[in-house]
From Swiss-Prot:
The family this protein is said to belong to: Belongs to the pterin-4-alpha-carbinolamine dehydratase family.
EC number: 4.2.1.96
Name assigned to this protein: Putative pterin-4-alpha-carbinolamine dehydratase
UniProt cross-references to HAMAP family, sorted A to Z: Pterin_4_alpha
Enzyme class per UniProt: lyase
Molecular function via GO: 4-alpha-hydroxytetrahydrobiopterin dehydratase activity
One GO term (biological process): tetrahydrobiopterin biosynthetic process
Source species: Xanthomonas axonopodis pv. citri (strain 306)
Pfam families assigned to the protein according to its UniProt record, in alphabetical order: Pterin_4a
């Protein structure tokens, strides 16, 4: 679906039902496109830990990520700590991972790589 443009440039679409749950072959295609992210929970979620120098930068990242989540209408689970954020994506409405999770993972990584919180 998003193969013609980079994931970070794609936008989330409403996805409901198990027809939108990604199979193993598609997961294997998409995972290399989001370096640093890992499959978790037997392939039902996508996670990555982002590290920061201090709490201020951690929260700045969380706030910027909230804007992305709002714009895409796709919201991660977050574990917020003093110097790191654990981000977890999964699409509850499909019972696992969807294209939206990979789109948002790519956008999240791009935010971090741009050093938006430095």
């Amino acid at each position: 679906m998003t193969d013609l443009i980079p994931l970070e440039q794609a936008h989330c679409l409403p996805r409901k039902g198990s027809d939108h749950k990604l199979g193993e072959a598609r997961l294997a295609e998409l995972l290399p496109q989001v370096p640093g992210w890992e499959l978790a929970e037997a392939g039902m979620a996508l996670t990555r830990t982002f590290r920061f120098a201090d709490y201020y930068r951690t929260l700045a990242f969380v706030n910027a990520l909230a804007w992305i989540a709002h714009r895409e209408d796709h919201h991660p689970d977050l574990g917020v700590h003093y110097d790191r954020v654990v981000v977890r994506y999964s699409t509850h409405d499909v019972g696992g991972l969807s294209e939206n999770d990979f789109i948002c993972a790519a956008k999240t990584a791009q935010l971090y790589d741009q050093g938006i919180t430095a």
